Amino acid sequence: MNTFLLDYNTILTPKKGFPKLFRDYTSEGSQRDSLLGRCFHLDDRKEADYYRQLGLLASRRFQRDSLVDMLQTQNRRFGGGEVREREIEKLRSPRCMAVVTGQQLGLFTGPLYTIYKALSAVVFAERQKALFPEYDFVPVFWLEGEDHDYDEPAHTAIFSGSGLTHFRPETNRRLPDQMVGSTCFDASIQNTLEAFLDMLPPSDYREEVATILRECYFPGNTFEGAFASMLLRLMPKEPLILLSSFDPAFKRMAAGVFTREIETAPASSYNVVAQSSTLEELGYGAQTKPRAVNLFHLNQHGQRQKIEHPSPDLFTLAGESRQYSRHQMLELVSDHPERFSPNVVLRPIVQDTVLPTFAYVAGPGEISYLAQYRRNYEHFGITMPFIVPRGSFTLVEPKISRIMDRMLQVTGRPGFSRKQIYAAVFSDLEGMKKKAVETAENRSLEPLFQEAREEIQRALDRLLPTLSKIDPTLEPMLGASKAQAEKIVENIEQKTWKAGRRKHEELLEQILKAETALFPEGGPQERLLNICYFLNKYGTGLIGTLKEQLQGHSSESHIILEL
């Protein structure tokens, strides 16, 4: 296996590439300094901030016993085993911190970056334990199942043939605006699963992958239950703790945040708008638009209702005519916190209020919108944790590596290293394609053939005076020879062009195959492909390999991993 690291600032090829804010966050220089100084509280490159964060968390009060009891119950339900039980128990101590990550639930674990996030949290927690052995750091994966947008999580894709095949289960048991996590699969999940397995080619690992999927995805299981069980089965030895946020026990611990949101509404929205103005001053766009109240209400069917705030002391629930005073809404929060759900603005605040979050492992998009929340953290009286970029990979199969070698040859860049060819492809794929095709079409040969014709004609013309003196009848023979030589050169040229076109078609087909593998549907591979495609070919040991790569490299570079 070969590994190459690419700077995020050089990756310009995918049409849905990495945001400018994220590229600056992972780079060096004054732009990063301004961004960190004005939009975040902590810098993971400053040693002093680590000690500061340890002190801040040690001085705060958390409901640790309640948190541990809830997590133990949840992880037993998901099949977490003794490894997770021991890890959860550590949280009872005030010297235990959490390294948190999270992800929207996805079909069959969703896109590759779900796995990368989980492993990144495990690795970062291990690093902190090595740096601060007197403390414990536990990796926690937040199961984002309260979202009501079903279409995105209920989807996954794998390579099949020369392209991609997409999978979406049908469901007849889902209500509009129902939370994704509580959605139960009906019989159609079996059809989706078998169709998915049929697209996996025969291999030594296919049965293992099929067994894991069938044990997790079956009629009657919830979306959250299936996702959680599969994630744990893929990482049986990792101390990853799963957290379900719509557990009533969790909502009771988060009730203080809900109360302050209602008490001060629309203050949190004003905070986000003000912080977004700071971002715009720095040259970045805002990713998130806050609402007057950044909470949803859950009705008896588990459907999320927007909370509207039409006047200073009135609140309404979407779809209902009843009005609530601020006092009545606060009573509802106090009596039934399980009926409330944070939106994207409030979710990080809830997370870092309930958990002793030392660091949050975030994707590129998350880092962009977390930059809008600094003032809101201050509004709720807590400090933002370290925001650490997750690991980012492009997995390259052997057949694609061979195509990269071919591109090295045909583009006339044999002196390039393997890293340089990847850097060239990731920075300007279209330019590389054009260069390769031009070379394959032998456009540079046209002047060579013309030069050959002219040299032959000049050589024969030099014979003419001498031949005419010897025997004038030789002159017509010379003319015929010139025509014959022209025809020979033309014939060679035509055959060369035909051979070039064949090579051109073959090369173009190979380049398109590589493009599909590296940038499926024009975006980063990790945002679309499902891990099962690779596990079927290379076994579940691949997850251990990915962890080793994260242990050996910084997550502030994109990792090209040749399998």
Curated annotation (Swiss-Prot):
Pfam families, alphabetized: CC_BshC, Rossmann-like_BshC
Any one Gene Ontology molecular-function term assigned to this protein's record: ligase activity
Coiled-coil parts of chain: 498-518
EC number from the UniProt entry: 6.-.-.-
Record keyword Electron transport present: no
Keywords associated with the record: Coiled coil, Ligase
InterPro entries membership: Bacillithiol_biosynth_BshC, CC_BshC, Rossmann-like_BshC
Keyword Coiled coil: yes
Superkingdom of the source species: Bacteria
Membership in a protein family: Belongs to the BshC family.
NCBIfam families attached to this UniProt entry: thiol_BshC
Protein's UniProt name: Putative cysteine ligase BshC
Organism: Chlorobium luteolum (strain DSM 273 / BCRC 81028 / 2530) (Pelodictyon luteolum)
